[in-house]
């Protein structure tokens, strides 16, 4: 097992990465201060891991909420299912919530924990590659709105993140590839050696080589930690982690959640950002080809599956957390491994990229 620490002073917490961690009772229970525990999971994960986690909590008063699975359920109505269970079971402010599942479960559990009685503790047990390398780390929580993704939420840090790599054994290939999109993102952001490592090992990674999987999860979490400790509330450098997300969120919003998995939409969004970086004169056409090749080898989409008009794309793009004073801030690349927040880009080049992908 490897341990990383996210140092946020009084809000600091460990990130445990290893195999068979769901059998390590003390690893989990030492981060539970009260007597009441609510496990939040979904219909896919519950049959696989709920009982295993429950067996670690026999000395606690515990209950569970089993939510429907899917991004389309990341709503206020589903969030109320968690609040209803907490109130029905008379959970007090000393309780701890445990998020057992992927990014949707983690985001909603964190938001519920931040809101219930003005804030209670929670723990992340991510079970998808995407949530292990990205959404479980850093304290972002929230739900979607019909007009925009993740537009309602709050920052609320967990007490710990417990990443059991063995949970990926039950992850289907599409979900695994979707997680690889976020891993590739870290290679593009500021870790060129990591990008090269991914290029060299992508076939073994897609075959789920356990030591390599452990390495990419560790490196991804380490990179995100380095960003979050500098900018917890995303007022500056943390915005870099949104590479591909402005474009990707538009795709998810217009097509409807479920057509593309989040990671699949981010794959297309990253390629759009890379192509705009090329048109702006930063990247060579060969570098664009390298990125596209890596995405394809990870079995990720490189074009939009579905019909979206360019005008609708731009309209929805303006409803984004990264829009300030009506200006869309984009994350572009000066080089592979060197991202930056771009406020001044040529509108005609942005339109050119959008038109290319919306045909």
Swiss-Prot record:
Zn(2+) binds at residues 182, 245, 262. The keyword Cytoplasm applies. It is found in: Cytoplasm. One of its GO terms (cellular component) is cytoplasm. Its EC number is 4.2.3.4. InterPro entries: Dehydroquinate_synthase, DHQ_synth_AroB, DHQ_synth_fam, DHQS/DOIS_N, DHQS_C. Pathway: Metabolic intermediate biosynthesis; chorismate biosynthesis; chorismate from D-erythrose 4-phosphate and phosphoenolpyruvate: step 2/7. Binds 1 divalent metal cation per subunit. Can use either Co(2+) or Zn(2+). Its cofactor is Co(2+); Zn(2+); NAD(+). One of its GO terms (biological process) is chorismate biosynthetic process. The keyword Cytoplasm applies. Keywords: Amino-acid biosynthesis, Aromatic amino acid biosynthesis, Cobalt, Cytoplasm, Lyase, Metal-binding, NAD, Nucleotide-binding, Zinc. NAD(+) binds at residues 69-74, 103-107, 127-128, 140, 149, 167-170. GO terms for molecular function: 3-dehydroquinate synthase activity; metal ion binding; nucleotide binding. It catalyses: 7-phospho-2-dehydro-3-deoxy-D-arabino-heptonate = 3-dehydroquinate + phosphate. Catalyzes the conversion of 3-deoxy-D-arabino-heptulosonate 7-phosphate (DAHP) to dehydroquinate (DHQ). Belongs to the sugar phosphate cyclases superfamily. Dehydroquinate synthase family. This is 3-dehydroquinate synthase. It comes from Ruthia magnifica subsp. Calyptogena magnifica.
């Amino acid at each position: 097992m490897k341990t990383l620490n996210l140092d946020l002073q009084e809000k600091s917490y460990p990130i445990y990465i290893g195999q068979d961690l769901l059998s390590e009772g003390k690893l989990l229970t030492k981060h539970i201060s009260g007597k009441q525990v609510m496990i939040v999971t979904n219909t896919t994960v519950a049959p696989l891991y709920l009982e295993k986690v429950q067996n670690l909590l026999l000395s606690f008063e515990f209950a569970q909420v089993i939510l429907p699975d899917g991004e389309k359920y990341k709503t206020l109505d589903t969030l109320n299912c968690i609040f209803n269970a907490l109130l029905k079971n008379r959970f007090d402010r000393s309780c701890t919530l445990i998020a057992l599942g992927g990014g949707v479960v983690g985001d909603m559990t964190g938001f519920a924990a931040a809101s219930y009685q003005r804030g209670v503790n929670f723990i992340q047990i991510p079970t998808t590659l995407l949530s292990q390398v990205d959404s479980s780390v850093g304290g972002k929580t929230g739900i979607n709105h019909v007009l925009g993704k993740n537009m309602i939420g709050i920052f609320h840090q967990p007490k710990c993140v417990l990443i059991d790599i063995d949970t990926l054994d039950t992850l289907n290939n599409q979900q695994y590839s979707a997680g690889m999109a976020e891993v590739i993102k870290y290679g593009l952001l500021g870790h060129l050696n990591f990008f090269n490592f991914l290029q060299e090992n992508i076939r073994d990674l897609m075959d789920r080589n356990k030591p390599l999987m452990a390495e990419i999860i560790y490196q991804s979490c380490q990179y995100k930690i380095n960003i979050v400790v500098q900018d917890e509330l995303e007022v500056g450098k943390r915005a870099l982690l949104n590479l591909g997300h402005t474009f990707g969120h538009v795709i998810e919003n217009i097509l409807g959640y479920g057509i593309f998995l989040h990671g699949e939409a981010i794959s297309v969004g990253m390629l759009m950002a890379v192509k705009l970086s090329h048109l702006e004169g930063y990247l060579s056409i060969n570098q664009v080809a390298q990125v596209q090749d890596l995405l394809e080898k990870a079995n990720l989409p490189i074009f939009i599956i579905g019909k979206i008009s360019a005008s609708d794309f731009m309209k929805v793009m303006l409803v984004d957390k990264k829009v300030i004073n009506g200006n869309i801030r984009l994350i572009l690349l000066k080089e592979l491994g060197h991202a930056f927040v771009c406020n001044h880009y040529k509108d005609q080049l942005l339109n050119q990229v959008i038109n290319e992908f919306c045909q």
